[in-house]
Amino acid sequence: MNLNILVILIFFTTVIGTFAIAQTNTSAQDQVELGETYKKADYGSWSLRCVRTNLEIDPCELFQILRNSSGSPVVEFTMLDFEPNASVIAGANVITPLETLLTSQLIVKIGDEASQSYPFAFCLKMGCVARIGLTETDLKRYKEGESATVIIVPANAPDSPQKLSLSLSGFTAGYAALIAN
């Protein structure tokens, strides 16, 4: 009799344990409400962030937060998936603090390449946005580079540009995942 009870207990423990494990292995995206953002994956210094929708595939973006020397978040650099046109094949939005000197533009320098300047398009409560259109050559630089420097100028300290490091570690894999999504 005791053997039968033991067998039944082992059976139910195994079944219940398997069920509990299956319940705890649900992905982050399955637990997100419609309209909420979730992190789908990390690629080196980049993260693939998506918004839960009713669509078959949730829209995503590849992003990285740039921090100053004291570790505070300063800039959000976001790569977007969009339909390429004649010369621009990729795009990015870069959000800087509201106190950025807009006339100085956003400057991006990849490795030893010449720096490129981008005008700010608009400002919102969360910050000022520069939109970057990338050509095939530009995108190749991001994929082949190790790091880039993003330079913004604080409005209250125009003689002290702030240089922030943009890691390109994981960019190629992250961008491939963005496009494949």
Task: Say what each PLM segment does.
Residues 22-181:
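A generic "folded-domain core" signal
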